[in-house]
Amino acid sequence: MTKTLIIMSHPDVAQSSSQQFLLAAINGEEQIQIRHLEAILAEREDYHFDKTIERACLQEADRIILQFPFYWYQCPSVMKQWMDEVLTLNLLQKGKKKEFGIVVTVGAKKDRYTAGGSVGFGIEELLRPYQALANQLGWNYQTPFVIYQFQYLSESKKQQLLVDYLYYLENGSQQFNEKEQWMLERMGYYENTHTQQVREWIVELKQEREELVMMLSEMGNEADGF
């Protein structure tokens, strides 16, 4: 089973509704390890990371995820410290490449992060340095998973976010067919561990898939008539 390592940085996780939601989502996920950088540093007398421990965690993981709030278009300072102290070209991957993804929470609206928005750049462009980092270390860079204005999401949107987040942690890809298959494989697990809204969303996803297949089939039949 794929092992996912989440490197999380947030100065006040206890007061962050988005981070608490994401932590609850991975509760019980044995293949996912999370390291909260601020909590780790709080236990270090010299306020520096143990390079041996951190690098061992990286080496054992198949998929590495950096998770953080977007502060002035970059990660929190503690995550930057972790990168400065832990990452080295000696981690350059040989053989099967690790996958490397970004989970970032943004307080502003999505339309601000466009060429015509107030920021003037898209999120993916602003996160480009992390892609360069992945390239240097020989990791496969995944499309970032961006959460905009979590506090304004409806309950149904949050439940959809929960499933999308778990899928991203395990698979990275957002192909519809792949996600549907993954959902069906894990349906029994969700029935026992997550909310009724998630279970209902799974059923809706399956129904939408069936309707899409039927519609495409009908379109094909109509084309055959010409």
Regions found by a protein language model. Name each.
Residues M1-L92, N177-F226:
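N-terminal beta1-alpha1-beta2 submodule of the flavodoxin-like/Rossmannoid cofactor-binding fold
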Residues M8-H10, L37, V104-G107, V146-I147:
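Short loop/turn segments at strand-loop or loop-helix junctions that form parts
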Residues S18-Q19, Y113-A115, S156:
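Short aromatic-enriched loop/helix-cap "lid" or pocket-rim segments at secondary-structure transitions
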Residues L41-E43, K110-T114, Q149-L153:
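A short acidic, helix-capping loop that chelates divalent metal ions and anchors anionic groups
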Residues V78-E85, P129, L161-D164:
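Alpha-helical scaffold elements adjacent to nucleotide-binding pockets in ATP/GTP-utilizing enzyme cores
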Residues K98-Q142:
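Short, glycine-/small-residue-rich phosphate/pyrophosphate-handling segment
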Residues N135-F150, L162, N171-T193:
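A conserved mid-domain beta-alpha-beta active-site/ligand-binding segment of alpha/beta enzyme cores
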